[in-house]
Structures are given as C-alpha cells and as structure tokens.
Amino acid sequence: MGRKWANIVAKKTAKDGATSKVYAKFGVEIYAAAKQGEPDPESNSALKFVIERAKQAQVPKHVIDKAIDKAKGGGDETFVQGRYEGFGPNGSMVIAETLTSNVNRTIANIRTIFNKKGGNIGAAGAVSYMFDNTGVIVFKGTDPDHIFEILLDAEVDVRDVTEEEGNIVIYTEATDLHKGIAALKAAGISEFSTTELEMIAQSEVELSPEDLEIFEGLVDALEDDDDVQKVYHNVANL
C-alpha cells in the first residue's frame, strides 16, 4: 500500500498549503459535530475526533474554540453530509464528500464543476464500489511487526501495517479505526500525524499528461469548493 500512502501524503500536503481553506472547512466540521451532540469533546466522541484531526492539520486553537463557541451560542445553521461521484478521462474516478448548509447550492456547484472541468457526474454508488472505506493511522516509527502484534492482541481488524519513510502506516477496517487508536494509546503511543477515514481505490490508473491536466483541474476545482470536505480518486500519478 506504499503508493496509497504516498497519495494520502500528497493530498494532505496540498491541502495543508491552502491554510485558510483548511481552517474554514475544519471550522464547519467542528461546528457541525458540536451541534449534533454536546459541545464538549470529553462527552462527544465525534467532536473529539474532529478536533484531533484539526490539530494534526495544525489548525490554530482559536479557530477550534470559535467553532465550538458558535455551537454553544446556539448557532442555527444545520449542516448535511453528502457524497458525489463521477468520472474523469480514461478510467479516472473521483468522489467528493461534502458538508453543507444548503444542499441545492452544493448540488448545483458540483454539477457545474464536473461539466466545466471535463468530468461526468454519476449516480450514487457509480464509483464508490471501487473504493474501500479504510481507517488510516500514521505516526513516527520503524517496527511494523511490533505494532501489528499490539493491534492483533487488541483484536483490531487490520488490513496492513507498513513502514514508510520513518512512519508506521496502519490500514484498518473503517469500523475499527477508533479501536486501533485506543489500542495504540494504551501501548503508550500518543502522537499521531494522521488518524483519518479514507476512501482508498481498489485499483489505480495512470493518465497521460493531457488527461492528467484535465483531471487535476477537476480535482482542484472540487477541493476549492467551500462545501467539499474531502476528495478521493484513483489516479496514481496525481
């Protein structure tokens, strides 16, 4: 899964570079999680997980606090999750996950992006069956066998554990991501660079330079949309 790890790192690095966008999107996600339960991460596990991910992306504390305070203050916005799937050139596939307070606006924007950027939007499930919803945990380390034993002892359903560039990279069943994190924390590991649910392509395609330029424009436009939280694809050379 080394190539998958490289793609995740590349995507994360690209998003981390656009800091204002990252902060704004995490602000929305934190607010939505706080509104759905108690605005206290100690009693709201979903909120706690989002805050941990925000810290990994180096979102400042004041951005996190502002989103929680907005939820505490009775903000009346309601956010709805969505997923849009489609195709790019030559066998390329893309999934955009959204969090929006205006579904009609989001649908219109996503359709426009696909139409203008050389893609074709598909029906629900059109490409997601070619992706696996996967827990990804990353932290500094060089002994994947030892980590695998820790997870095995904790009965975590693990797909793979690898060492990549001085990092331990763990792929779990999506339902066991939090169980895996808890097992690692119990073993004394507390600093993570990634704890995410990712849609990982079962197989990948490589595009020609011309097709890659088109597909990259599609992905960039989706990622730039304020309502889009995550974009997944199956292109190996992007």
Swiss-Prot record:
Q: Which GO terms describe its biological process?
A: regulation of DNA-templated transcription
GO MF entry, a single one: DNA binding
Q: Where in the cell is it found?
A: Cytoplasm
Q: Which Pfam families match?
A: TACO1_YebC_N, Transcrip_reg
Query: Which keywords does this chain's UniProt record carry?
Result: Cytoplasm, DNA-binding, Transcription, Transcription regulation
Classification via InterPro entries: Integrase-like_N, TACO1_YebC-like_2nd/3rd_dom, TACO1_YebC_N, Transcrip_reg_TACO1-like, Transcrip_reg_TACO1-like_dom3, Transcrip_reg_TACO1_YeeN, YebC-like
GO CC terms on record? Answer: cytosol
Family, similarity comment = Belongs to the TACO1 family. YeeN subfamily.
NCBIfam families noted in UniProt: PRK12378.1, YebC/PmpR family DNA-binding transcriptional regulator
Q: What is the protein name stated in its UniProt record?
A: Probable transcriptional regulatory protein YeeN
Query: From which source organism is this entry?
Result: Salmonella typhimurium (strain LT2 / SGSC1412 / ATCC 700720)
Its gene is yeeN
